[in-house]
C-alpha cells in the first residue's frame, strides 16, 4: 500500500511540475513594453514555424541590428494567411510589435507585412 501511495504522490508531483513549467514558459506578455509600439523592417535570416509560437530572426534594414521576433502560434498564423513559405530566410518584411523589457533585441509581433500584405497576429 505504501508503494502505491508513494508512486501516486510522485506522479502527481511530476505532473504539477510539468504543468507549472509549461505555463510559465508559454505566456509572459507582460515582459514586453506595450506602451511603446515599434516597427522594424528588414530581411529574415532564420525562421521557426513551430509551436508554441513561431519565431524569426530579422536583420533590420536600418542599422543591421538582428531582432528575435516572436510570432503567433502556427494554427493562428495559418488561419490568418501567414504560411511557412512567407517567413522563410531571405524574405523582406516589416513587423509592428513591442520590445522586450529586458532583452534589447527581442520583440513580440502584433502584425507582419509581407509583399504589401499586412497580417494580424494577435
Enumerate the predicted regions with their spans.
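Short aromatic-glycine-enriched beta-strand elements
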Residues: 50-59
Amino acid at each position: 500500500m505504501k508503494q502505491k501511495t508513494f508512486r501516486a504522490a510522485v506522479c502527481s508531483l511530476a505532473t504539477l511540475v510539468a504543468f507549472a513549467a509549461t505555463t510559465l514558459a508559454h505566456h509572459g506578455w507582460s515582459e514586453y513594453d506595450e506602451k511603446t509600439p515599434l516597427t522594424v523592417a528588414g530581411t529574415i535570416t532564420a525562421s521557426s514555424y513551430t509551436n508554441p509560437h513561431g519565431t524569426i530572426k530579422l536583420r533590420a534594414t536600418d542599422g543591421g541590428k538582428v531582432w528575435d521576433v516572436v510570432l503567433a502560434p502556427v494554427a493562428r498564423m495559418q488561419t490568418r494567411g501567414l504560411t511557412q513559405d512567407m517567413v522563410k530566410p531571405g524574405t523582406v518584411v516589416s513587423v509592428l510589435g513591442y520590445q522586450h523589457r529586458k532583452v534589447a533585441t527581442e520583440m513580440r509581433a502584433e502584425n507582419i507585412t509581407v509583399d504589401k500584405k499586412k497580417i494580424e497576429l494577435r
